[in-house]
Structures are given as structure tokens and as C-alpha cells.
């Protein structure tokens, strides 16, 4: 297909010479753009492509509210820190909002294995079913399930413990070997969490578990680990010289997970059947929740814009303009605003 260029010629009769105007009309535009070769080129017309504003709030996405963790971290929420109990009622969300310096995480000090990977897994979850994987009253008849509390996880001034875990202790002077299994019949991935207690001294080990040589074994089709408690005095954290290390795995549908131990097991109480949703995510933000609805959420605030690009924040959730680092991005819809004049 041949392209044709139409050029307008304006001829004027003059005494000394003829003047011919070639091209287009200049205007009063002050639009400037940067090109590959030049900066601040004035053009006749241009349109803005870059959104640089937000409302500074956390909003619903397409009518669905986020899960706002408040003073709780992802760890505190998923383990069941007693101070995060109010969050358990929310079963679905558009995204998860966590504050940068949340106070309520692992109330009993210790190491949370593969924590960043767990956050990554939860970032794609939009709802879950929280259910008793091992019911408290019937699963552990030979062990005590009520004495495993600690001042470091206190609630309303009383010693307490995580709402999704059970600290099993000796019963009538004995801690029999235990073996407990669960078959995933949920037709969804199930998130299972547990812990291993590492006392600070051998006296505590004997008093709580009635053995000096304890082990914890956890086995499924995709997970196989054996843990040996490390008894050692450590610097006090939240008043504790002992530690609990926290672990998790995803159990596929129809797979089986088996727990065996002769001491030191922090057993699963509740687990989570996960439903993944397109467009979910986790943001870290100090922004407050507001009665607003948006298509795009950033940690700085929500964006409601039809422009194709934004420079508010690289982390986004929802239907968002593409992030660019530019401070100005315009598309030229006219020509250079300098007419060409030729005399003859």
C-alpha cells in the first residue's frame, strides 16, 4: 500500500518576492516531550500516559475487602497468636495487608523455617477453610493438652498458646510414643503447621517429656524430616531461654501426613484448606482502610485510572497500569511546534 503525503502550499503575491508556507499551523501549545535525540521538544499536541496519584487508602478490590492484619504479622496470623484471634473469622479476601512493624508474630521465640516461601504461597490464596486436623479433645488421649501454655503468649493477662497448635506434655508421669496421621480428603491443598520445642536445660526436658532422647518425625509423599531437640541455654527472648522452631508443608489431595514423636512435638490443631485466586497478593503498608472500591491497590494507596502506566509503586494488586520509573510520559499526537518558512 502506497503512502501519500499531502502538502499544502500557500502562495502570496509580493512586490519583491513570493513566500511559500509548507507544513502545518503553529499554535500556542507549551507541551514538551523528550525524544531519543532531544529533550524538551515543544509539540503541537500530546497526551499524558502516566498516572502519578493515589488516594492514600486501602480499598476493596471489585467489592471484596482485604484481610488487614493490623498489629499481626503473617506468622502471628497463620500460627494463631492469641492476640490475632479476631482475624480467624475472615475466610476470604481480595488481598492481605500487613504493616511494616507488626508486633504480634511468633510469641514464643524461635526460627520459622522457609518463612518467605510460605508468604509467597499465601500471596496467591484468596480464601481458606480452617479446620481441626487433630481435634484437641480426642486426638491425644495419652498426653496432656491443657498445660502447654506460656507467659510469652499471654492473652488477657493469662498464660496462653497459639490457637492453631497444641503443646503436648506428659500425662500421669508418662509421655508414650505417639503416631498420628491425617489423609487429605479436602480436594484442595492443605497447609499443615507444627513445631519442635528446644528446652533450655535437661531438667525441663525431663519434667515436660519424661525422656532425654526425644525425636519428632514428619512424613508425607513430598516431605520427610526427623528432628532432634537441641537442649541448650540461650539468651532470653520474651522471657524465654528455650525455643520453638516452626515448620510447615503443603499436603496434596489424597496424600497422607504422619507425625511420630516421643517428646517435644508442638502438634497441629488447626490446618487450612487453601483456595487460590488470580489477582490476590500481600502488600506491606501503613495505609488505613477506607470505605472505597478500586481496581488497583498499591502500598501507597489505591489507583483509579484508565492510563496505561503509573509511577506510584512497583508492587500492585488487581488490574493496574504498568509501573515505570519515569516522572513524565507523554505520547505525541501532533508535530514539532516550529513551522518551516521558505522564501524565494
Swiss-Prot record:
Please identify the protein, giving its name as recorded: Hemagglutinin
Q: Which organism is it from?
A: Influenza A virus (strain A/Xianfeng/3/1989 H1N2)
Q: Which GO terms describe its molecular function?
A: host cell surface receptor binding
Family under the similarity heading: Belongs to the influenza viruses hemagglutinin family.
Q: Which GO terms describe its biological process?
A: clathrin-dependent endocytosis of virus by host cell; fusion of virus membrane with host endosome membrane; fusion of virus membrane with host plasma membrane; virion attachment to host cell
Q: What does this protein do?
A: Binds to sialic acid-containing receptors on the cell surface, bringing about the attachment of the virus particle to the cell. This attachment induces virion internalization of about two third of the virus particles through clathrin-dependent endocytosis and about one third through a clathrin- and caveolin-independent pathway. Plays a major role in the determination of host range restriction and virulence. Class I viral fusion protein.
User: Where does it reside?
Assistant: Virion membrane; Host apical cell membrane
What does the subunit comment say? Homotrimer of disulfide-linked HA1-HA2.
PTM summary: In natural infection, inactive HA is matured into HA1 and HA2 outside the cell by one or more trypsin-like, arginine-specific endoprotease secreted by the bronchial epithelial cells. One identified protease that may be involved in this process is secreted in lungs by club cells. Palmitoylated.
Topology term for the membrane: Single-pass type I membrane protein
Specify the superkingdom: Viruses
Entries under InterPro entries matching the protein: Capsid_hemagglutn (IPR008980), Hemagglutn_HA1_a/b_dom_sf (IPR013828), Hemagglutn_influenz_A (IPR000149), Hemagglutn_influenz_A/B (IPR001364)
Q: What else is known?
A: Major glycoprotein, comprises over 80% of the envelope proteins present in virus particle. The extent of infection into host organism is determined by HA. Influenza viruses bud from the apical surface of polarized epithelial cells (e.g. bronchial epithelial cells) into lumen of lungs and are therefore usually pneumotropic. The reason is that HA is cleaved by tryptase clara which is restricted to lungs. However, HAs of H5 and H7 pantropic avian viruses subtypes can be cleaved by furin and subtilisin-type enzymes, allowing the virus to grow in other organs than lungs.
Q: Could you tell me which cysteines form disulfide bridges? A: 59-292, 72-84, 107-153, 296-320
Q: Where is the signal peptide?
A: 1-17
Tell me yes or no: is Membrane among this UniProt entry's keywords.
yes
Q: In the UniProt record, which residues carry a glycan?
A: 27-28, 40, 71, 104, 142, 177, 286, 304
Entry keyword set: Clathrin- and caveolin-independent endocytosis of virus by host, Clathrin-mediated endocytosis of virus by host, Disulfide bond, Fusion of virus membrane with host endosomal membrane, Fusion of virus membrane with host membrane, Glycoprotein, Hemagglutinin, Host cell membrane, Host membrane, Host-virus interaction, Lipoprotein, Membrane, Palmitate, Signal, Transmembrane, Viral attachment to host cell, Viral envelope protein, Viral penetration into host cytoplasm, Virion, Virus endocytosis by host, Virus entry into host cell
Pull one GO CC term from this UniProt entry: virion membrane
Amino acid at each position: 500500500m502506497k503512502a501519500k503525503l499531502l502538502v499544502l502550499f500557500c502562495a502570496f503575491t509580493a512586490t519583491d518576492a513570493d513566500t511559500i508556507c509548507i507544513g502545518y499551523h503553529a499554535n500556542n501549545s507549551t507541551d514538551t516531550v523528550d525524544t531519543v535525540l532531544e529533550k524538551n521538544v515543544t509539540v503541537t499536541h500530546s497526551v499524558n500516559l502516566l498516572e502519578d496519584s493515589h488516594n492514600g487508602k486501602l480499598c476493596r478490590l471489585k467489592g471484596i475487602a482485604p484481610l488487614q492484619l493490623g498489629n499481626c504479622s503473617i506468622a502471628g496470623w497463620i500460627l494463631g497468636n492469641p492476640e490475632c484471634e479476631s482475624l480467624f473469622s475472615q475466610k476470604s479476601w481480595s488481598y492481605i495487608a500487613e504493616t511494616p512493624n507488626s508486633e504480634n508474630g511468633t510469641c514464643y521465640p524461635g526460627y520459622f523455617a522457609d518463612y518467605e516461601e510460605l508468604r509467597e504461597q499465601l500471596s496467591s490464596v484468596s480464601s481458606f477453610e480452617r479446620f481441626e486436623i487433630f481435634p484437641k479433645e480426642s486426638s491425644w488421649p495419652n498426653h496432656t493438652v491443657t498445660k502447654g501454655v506460656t507467659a510469652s503468649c499471654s492473652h488477657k493477662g493469662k498464660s496462653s498458646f497459639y490457637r492453631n497448635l497444641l503443646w503436648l506434655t506428659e500425662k500421669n508421669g508418662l509421655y508414650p510414643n505417639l503416631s498420628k496421621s491425617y489423609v487429605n480428603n479436602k480436594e484442595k491443598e492443605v497447609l499443615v503447621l507444627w513445631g519442635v520445642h528446644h528446652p533450655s536445660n535437661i531438667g525441663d526436658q525431663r519434667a515436660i517429656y519424661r525422656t532425654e532422647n526425644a525425636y519428632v518425625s514428619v512424613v508425607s509423599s513430598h516431605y520427610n524430616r526427623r528432628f532432634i531437640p537441641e537442649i541448650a541455654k540461650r539468651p532470653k527472648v520474651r522471657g524465654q531461654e528455650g525455643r520453638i522452631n516452626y515448620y510447615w508443608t503443603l499436603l496434596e489431595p489424597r496424600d497422607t501426613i504422619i507425625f511420630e514423636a516421643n517428646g517435644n512435638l508442638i502438634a497441629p490443631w488447626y490446618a487450612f484448606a487453601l483456595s487460590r485466586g488470580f489477582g490476590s497478593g500481600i502488600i506491606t503498608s501503613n495505609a488505613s482502610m477506607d470505605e472505597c472500591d478500586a481496581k488497583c491497590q498499591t502500598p501507597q494507596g489505591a489507583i483509579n485510572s484508565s492510563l496505561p502506566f503509573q509511577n506510584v509503586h512497583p508492587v500492585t494488586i488487581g488490574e493496574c497500569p504498568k509501573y515505570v520509573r519515569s516522572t513524565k510520559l507523554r505520547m505525541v499526537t501532533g508535530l514539532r511546534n516550529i513551522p518551516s518558512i521558505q522564501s524565494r
